[in-house]
């Protein structure tokens, strides 16, 4: 793990957060005036999906894969709450069942979710993800500075950008590392830049709020035991800032015109809104009268 260890606590504006429930409470002036990496990606992938999630706030059934990600994230967060010597594979596996029981109680639709999914195999695969985590790094060798950290920054002539960082490590030398866990497989080389957008989004916030560019961005892919590592430059973060402002400008135009165009792609296979999507012969519901706040 090198020299990254517990060094200091960065003080950002914090909010109540719960991975188990999957709910985020964000106290901001208006959802129209804020942007997270997830919502930015929604708009880039399909403006209509952004509308369904942000304006219409349509419910989406939970998926077994997403729930597994929530479970593993919660276990890793709890693991770092233990003393270093207790952060072992056996201890992580011991945490799985009680964490799953809590998650099951907090999540609606679990029974329906596992009608077509083998629960036993699903839990086995979650154990496998934990094993792969320990093959990627040794959590006994360092203490994180922050876990599930909410960060935000008000862009000039733009939105309040915000997000949750899975883990923030600060070295004794002051170098910052942003770490994000992914329970899926690592992207092919052609798609790495798209995956790094989220991490540069976070790095931009830290740079603008702290005046220091993070040294390393690290994505840990537990699905195939791979790392994606990047050392961001000022030029890359300035480019990311411009990209965010461009996305934001397009979103504002959609608000003004009421046009939220669907964009057909392979991602449509996982979309919960095909029945009301024009690309699949559906009709979206009327836009709410008030969409600005």
Q: Which residues are covered by each model-predicted region?
A:
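Hydrophobic (often cysteine-bearing) scaffold residues that line and stabilize catalytic clefts
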Residues: 64, 68, 72, 122, ...
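C-terminal, charged and often intrinsically disordered regions of DNA end-processing helicases
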Residues: 5-66, 293
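Short, polar/flexible loop-turn hinges at active-site or ligand-entry regions and domain interfaces
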Residues: 56-65, 82-87, 188-189, 258-260
């Amino acid at each position: 793990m090198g020299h990254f260890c517990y060094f200091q606590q960065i003080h950002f504006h914090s909010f109540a957060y719960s991975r188990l429930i999957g709910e985020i409470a964000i106290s901001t002036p208006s959802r129209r005036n804020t942007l997270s990496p997830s919502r930015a990606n929604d708009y880039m992938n399909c403006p209509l999906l952004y509308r369904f999630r942000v304006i219409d706030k349509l419910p989406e059934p939970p998926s077994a894969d997403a729930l597994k990600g929530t479970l593993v994230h919660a276990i890793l967060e709890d693991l770092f709450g233990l003393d270093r010597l207790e952060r072992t594979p056996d201890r992580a596996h011991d945490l799985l069942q009680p964490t799953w029981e809590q998650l099951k109680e907090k999540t609606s639709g679990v029974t329906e979710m596992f009608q077509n999914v083998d629960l036993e195999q699903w839990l086995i695969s979650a154990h496998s993800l934990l094993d792969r985590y320990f093959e990627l790094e040794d959590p006994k060798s360092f203490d994180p500075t922050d876990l599930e950290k909410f960060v935000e920054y008000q862009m000039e002539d733009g939105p309040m950008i915000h997000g949750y960082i899975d883990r923030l490590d600060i070295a004794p030398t002051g170098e910052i590392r942003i770490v994000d866990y992914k329970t899926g497989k690592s992207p092919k080389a052609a798609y790495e830049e798209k995956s790094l957008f989220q991490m540069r989004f976070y790095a931009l916030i830290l740079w603008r709020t702290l005046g220091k560019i993070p040294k390393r961005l690290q994505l840990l892919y537990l699905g195939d035991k791979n790392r994606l590592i990047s050392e961001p430059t000022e030029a890359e973060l300035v480019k990311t800032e411009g990209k965010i402002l461009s996305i934001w400008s397009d979103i504002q135009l959609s608000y003004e015109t009421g046009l939220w165009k669907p964009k057909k792609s392979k991602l449509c296979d996982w979309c919960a809104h095909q029945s009301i999507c024009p690309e699949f012969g559906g009709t979206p519901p009327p836009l709410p009268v008030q969409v600005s706040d």
